Structure formats: C-alpha cells, structure tokens
A protein has these predicted regions:
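Long, contiguous amphipathic alpha-helices that act as assembly "spine/axial" helices in icosahedral shell
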Residues: 125-196, 346-348
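Low-complexity "stalk/linker" and mucin-like segments enriched in Ser/Thr/Pro/Ala/Gly
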Residues: 411-426
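Assembly/oligomerization interface modules of large self-assembling protein complexes
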Residues: 54-139
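Solvent-exposed, low-complexity, repeat-rich "mucin-like" stalks and linkers
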Residues: 374-404
C-alpha cells in the first residue's frame, strides 16, 4: 500500500487539539475539549506541566502526524510503484509462465508413440527481489517548541509538521528518486526496449502522441520484444502507465492527450505519470541512500537521458514492497524524551524492497536510433593451467539505448572440452589436449550479432 494521503477535516488549532484529545483515552478522560474562539494556551499548560499528559500528547502526535500534513506536503506522482507489503522473510519470488511447447501430431505419433506418458516441465521463469532498503529518519523537538505550539493560532499545526510530517515527506521523496534512478539505470543498461520516433522535432503534437499510441496498442498483444526475459507477455490498456517529462506534457493540451492517447480525461489521470526530468537526479542524496549500489551517471549518459520524452511501462513493472516491521505497519514511528537535553527525539523506520521486474513490458521513446559500435573482451589474452578457469567480461559500446547483453561462445578449443557460461566464466578441463593449446572465446552482441569481441587463452 502507498502512504496515506488523506488529511483531517480540521480548520484551526482548536479543532486539531480536540481531535488529538479524543484520540487518546488518557487525555480524553482528564482534559476538557477547547472552546471555539478561545485560546488553547491554558490546555497547553496542563499538558506541558504533567509528564503523563505530555507523553500521551506526543504519542498521539506520532500516530496522526502523517494525516495532517498541510504545508510542505507533496504528492508522489509515482505512488503506483508500491505493490504491497512483505510480512515474513527477506525475499519476494516473482514467478511467471511462458506459453506451453507445441507439438506436431503426425510427427510425434510417428517418432515417439510413447511420448504421452512423459512429463513436460512448464516454461517457468522466476526472479528474486530482496529487502535492500533499511533506513531511518530522525528529528528532535524541544519543550520550548511544545510550549509555543499552544501560544498562537497555527503553531500547533507547525509543531506537528516539525515533529512528524517531514519524516514522512523525506521518505516519500526518497521513494521517488530511487524509483527514478532504477528506471533510468534500466534504460541505460539496455533492458528497456527502445522505440524510435523518427523525425521527432518536425512532428506535430498529435503525430507524436500517435507514435506513442502505436506501441501502446502493441502492448495489448502477447509479444516477447518488450521485456529482457523474452516472455510472450501482454498488458491491457488499464495496466499501462505512460511516464512523460514535464516539457513533453506541456507541449500538449489536455484535449490532445485525452482524445489521441487516452479514452478520456479520467483515464488520462489514472494512467499518466509525470517526471520532472529523466536526466536530472539528486545525486548526493542517492549516494547516501544506495551507498555502494549507486553508480553515478556519466556526462554521455545524462545527454542521452535528456532526449527521452516518455516511457511506457506495465503498472507492475516496479516491484516495490514495504517490509512490515514487527508485522504491524509499513513504517514504524518511535520517540523518546531525553531528560538531559529536554528534547523529544522522533524516529521513522522504513524497510523496503526496491526493484523492477524483468518480465513486465516496458519501452522508452527516443528520437534517435540506438546502435552497437563495438564489443571488447577483457582480458584479451591470458594463460590458464589445465583444470583452471578465468573470468572474462565484455564491454559493449553503444549509442542511444540498446541491449548491452552478449552471447558467449567457444570459437576455438571446444574440441578439447573448453567451455564458457552465460556470465563469461571459462573452464578448462584437466585433460585438455587439443591440437593447439590456444582457446578463443567470442562475445557476440545480442542486439547486433555483427559486432563481436574475442579473447585468446593459452593453456599451459
């Protein structure tokens, strides 16, 4: 579930204080409700001067703080990325079945009459998503701030904002920038299928929207070309999300988008998500959030990302989940009073899974065509003893957004038993005795099989 966005139907501090008192039995049993039009300062003094009442007040503020954000609140346009909650364990296993194998009746009858008793394993694909975000946010409030909350109109709202609301606002913002980072990294890695909009600069707004709509229509048919796993997947219109940058959206009137792409304005509001920019990121905060997992964007990558007008994804493409701390809620709020500093420390803990699906459909719209310019393998030459192994890596140089994956193969030395797996790990058997002691490994671009790189291995 996403963070709640509801706000309380209160108009002033008296109504807000009445709500807080009614929410806590300790307060409601011992303190009278404020009278509209009268100062709440006398009630504030009662609360401040009694430790039991003060603690009850702070605890209630912790519980309701999320629902009364009103000043610096921001609605995350990507609330759809949260899929649910994880109650137990640290992993979520995503399973999907591809189509069943098909057989020719006459051929099978002739070649394998007993085939009907054989078991056929379903074409099952799976991917594991793990809890990878364990953060907490902290702020402090003083007795002086609590006392000021009852001094004049508006101060009670301000106190709760300072104590609680910005904790949630910080988490909400961090969710957005991490999701945006994951999307852009997938695009740059080439695992989001590119769709070129030719002559983009000369097209009219309606023609540009028409180009977007053409791929949206294709999404509704089973197609293996829009996910890196090659699953024959279809996505209905209702489950498609179109992410557009603010400049792209500003070029179109509501009428153009609502009539040329979406069914109506209501459909547009449900399936259109804005992004401030594909190329601008809060790098300093991302570094603190992701630590070693953060890979800074290069200038060339930023230049390519800046060209993107829109991205189309399945609603289930993002795999974000809250981990239920103590199996109680999406987040955990805690506070304690420090008698030495006379301050309340407020904490918000959030554990999450931030991930994306390799099976759901996605495409990135781009005005330029992507190409593979070169494939290189490192190390280019090495010496390995019989029975040993060596790890090779491939670097695929590209322009635009294309799949950077490669297919590994043994192009010389396979007769001696040399093998290479899909990750580039080469193994030489202990009995390796080819006519020549040299082994050649080739990495072939998946996107453009005319581009290859090779490595030579000498078996000592």
């Amino acid at each position: 579930m996403a963070l709640r966005k509801n706000t309380l139907a209160v108009q002033n501090d008296s109504e807000l204080l009445s709500y807080i008192i009614n929410q806590n039995p300790i307060l409601s049993e011992n303190i009278d409700l404020p009278v509209q039009g009268e100062s709440i300062k006398p009630i504030g003094q009662i609360i401040i001067n009694n430790e039991r009442y003060r603690n009850a007040f702070i605890n209630t503020v912790n519980l309701i703080g999320l629902t009364i954000i009103k000043r610096n609140g921001w609605d995350n346009p990507w609330d759809f990325t949260v899929r649910g909650t994880l109650s137990f364990g640290q992993q979520i296993r995503e399973l999907i079945l591809d189509l069943c194998n098909v057989y020719d009746y006459n051929k099978e009858l002739k070649e394998d009459e007993a085939g009907f008793i054989k078991s056929v394993v379903p074409n099952v694909f799976n991917y594991i998503h793990e809890v990878n975000f364990q953060k907490f946010y902290k702020t402090s409030t003083s007795d002086a701030q609590l006392a000021m909350a009852f001094e004049r109109e508006g101060n009670l709202f301000r106190f709760i904002e300072e104590a609680i609301s910005m904790l949630y606002e910080s988490l909400k913002y961090d969710r957005f920038i991490v999701d945006k980072y994951m999307l852009c990294r997938r695009i740059l890695d080439g695992t989001v299928t590119p769709t070129q909009i030719a002559n983009y600069d000369t097209l009219t707004p309606r023609q540009r929207v028409s180009a977007l709509k053409a791929v949206s229509n294709k999404f509704t048919f089973r197609n293996p070309n829009y996910n890196p796993a090659g699953i024959r997947k279809a996505t209905s219109f209702d489950d498609q999300i179109l992410i557009v940058n603010t400049e792209f959206e500003a070029d179109f009137s509501t009428d153009v988008l609502a009539t040329s792409y979406f069914r109506d304005e209501a459909d547009m509001r449900a399936r259109l998500a804005l992004i401030d920019s594909f190329s601008q990121h809060d790098n300093d905060r991302l570094q603190k959030l992701l630590l070693d997992a953060y890979i800074p964007f290069t200038e060339d990558e930023i230049e390519e990302l800046e060209k993107i007008p829109a991205v189309l994804i399945s609603r289930e493409w993002f795999m974000d989940y809250y981990y239920l701390l103590d199996n109680a809620g999406e987040t955990k709020e805690l506070s304690f009073y420090n008698p030495q500093t006379l301050r309340n420390n407020h904490f918000l803990h959030a554990w999450m899974v931030f991930s994306t699906s390799p099976f759901e459909q996605a495409t990135v719209y781009t005005p330029t065509a992507g190409t593979v310019t070169a494939v290189s393998v490192s190390p280019q030459s090495s010496t390995v003893s019989a029975g040993g192994q060596v790890q090779l890596t491939a670097k695929v140089t590209t322009t635009g957004f294309v799949n950077k994956a490669v297919k590994w193969s043994v192009t010389k030395g396979s007769e001696g038993g040399a093998t290479v797996d899909q990750n580039g790990l080469v193994k030489i058997p202990s009995g390796f005795t080819p006519a020549s002691s040299a082994v050649q490994i080739t990495a072939t671009s998946i996107y453009d099989n005319t581009k290859t790189g090779t490595a030579s291995i000498t078996v000592a």
